[in-house]
Amino acid sequence: MSEAEYLKAVEMLNIWAKAYYTQDNPLATDIEYDVLYKKVETFENEFPDLKVSYSPTNRVGDAVSEGFEKINHKAKMWSMEDIFDDNELLAWLERGEKAGLEFFVEPKFDGASLNLTYENGVLISAGTRGNGETGENVTQNVKVINSIPLQIDYKEKIEIRGEVVIAKSDFDALNDERANSGENLFANPRNAAAGSLRQLDSAVVKSRHLKFFPWDVGENSLNFKKHSEIMEFVRNLGFLKDDFVRVCASLTDLRKAYVDLHEMRERKDILMDGMVIRINELTKCENMGYTIKFPRFMVAYKFPPVEKATKLIDINLQVGRTGVITPVGVLEPVNIDGATVRNATLHNFDEIARLGLMKGDIVSIIRSGDVIPKITGVFGARRNGSETPIKRPEFCPVCGSRLLVEDIFIRCQNLTCKARIVNSLIYFCSKKCMNIDGLGEAIINTLFEKGKIINISDIYTLKADDLEGLEGFKDKKISNLLASIENSRISPLYRFITALGIEHIGEVAARKIAEIFGENWLNASFDEILKIDGFGEAMAKSFVGFCEINREKIENLLSFLHLSAQKTEISQNVFTKKTVVITGTLSISRDEMKEKLIKMGANVTNSVSKKTDFVLFGKDAGSKLEKAKMLGVKAISEDEFKEML
């Protein structure tokens, strides 16, 4: 094969791949493709200096990365404003004189946003959205996604933006495979797509069958007048095109498009959570510009949460670290929004009574985004007499001890109950507590069953000899685990207090105790604790009682640790003593943002109420942002947050 023949073969393979992967229109048999591919591969092995970057052999996916470098986008990747009903749509249309304009609409696929950069017709880089200006360089992984061309027929520099997704059918197959391997399941296709894109091993990425759907361009030198023309041009370069793309000229057209797309929601193999509406005329878009948060010329009309009916087969009882028994509904598997739902939390037995639940009932299940599936109602009229009552338990399902009823809670009081011990160990080692990487649920259960860890202090006496010979424990894993345990010995005091799992004492309360009492925290009296801002009698009683009963165990634990309790000096600012809820994806992790806010004197909570002062939201914010709007709580974007500092 000559160099000219090689280049022609590469071109032919790319044409065939484009027809197969993006047009669903094979131009060659698998055998023809494989034979030509092998010839190209042989030539490249003989003449590696002549190999071109857009060769299909670059999609093999055998590279393992050490991590991801940062990459800057030439043009900012903006978030979109969300709307949830026709009234909000009408209000958006009335802002900025949008009447009489043409609108481009398409599905809002729920995946991971990606920015591709091409120069001289060749893919040179790919970056995740990140904070909109800087993302992670995932070029190596993107090269194994078959629906992303390595070469395009356009020589000018251009950024092409879109969504990396995984089909529902591929998602189900992936989770089945993970279940068979004993791995944790992905919550939904969006998490699977985002997680796959950030795999260090591109062979894993290739096996996930990711797809890329373009939805915009960044930096470019195109001369089109309409967004629809740009997208037609981009898709003709070899990218996927969804079968639902419309140009609408009125509110009636937009409403019809939304209804039509919503009806397709279940049938589509790609998870979508709404419809994107944007002004089609590019000059008008440019004139309208941007707010601090969003483009003024586009909006995401979100779909309502998916609700399904299924059968409640049974009730499982879970025993938490404090002994509280939580009923979990076991469901006939049902697919909701791209995820197979098999369980739903029921919180407590008062909730079961409120709903009037019986085993065998047909129930209504709702799931929105990452929210835990919830039973919202019972179809009582569909009962056939086979249903059975759900009885409150009298004995612990794990240790058999008689249970104590405290208000709405039912509790196991046996401190040696296996479930309580194991869950306490898991909580102690968790990221927000002592952050012992490698000591997760599965490993803790194994170590407990083998008698290697019976209580928390046993963690700090573990030796390599204790771990050798256990299934899955090789030298490297043992070394990493022991190093992680060693690193946890030096920790902020508040993390240790949090890790003890004292009822009513979470991270925020633990921080206050650590800052006020420092090294003398263990000797704080009921009256002293009660004086702390935000503390009530239940919190004070729980903390002091726990410390009195477990003082010897705590002091033993402290002998293994070096804890610091530095008092933070807080300068008065807009967030001091304000209650803040964080939702959505930010440019930094949620824990990092939480730490920032706490250092400014804010109280960071998990749920939105009338007492919430701010909801800080990022990309893909869900029900918390909706609730903030409903309650009139001030919602701020990350950009607004920075402006307020």
UniProtKB/Swiss-Prot annotation:
Similarity section: Belongs to the NAD-dependent DNA ligase family. LigA subfamily.
Binding-site residues, Zn(2+): C396, C399, C412, C417
PANTHER family the record matches: CHROMOSOME TRANSMISSION FIDELITY FACTOR 18, DNA LIGASE
Gene Ontology terms describing biological process: DNA repair; DNA replication
Cofactor: Mg(2+); Mn(2+)
Gene that specifies this protein: ligA
A Pfam family of this chain: HHH_2
Domain BRCT intervals: 570-645
Name of this chain's protein: DNA ligase
UniProtKB keywords: DNA damage, DNA repair, DNA replication, Ligase, Magnesium, Manganese, Metal-binding, NAD, Zinc
Primary role: DNA ligase that catalyzes the formation of phosphodiester linkages between 5'-phosphoryl and 3'-hydroxyl groups in double-stranded DNA using NAD as a coenzyme and as the energy source for the reaction. It is essential for DNA replication and repair of damaged DNA.
InterPro entries named in the record: BRCT_dom, BRCT_dom_sf, DisA/LigA_HHH, DNA_ligase, DNA_ligase_AS, DNA_ligase_CS, DNAligase_adenylation, DNAligase_N
Disulfide topology: none
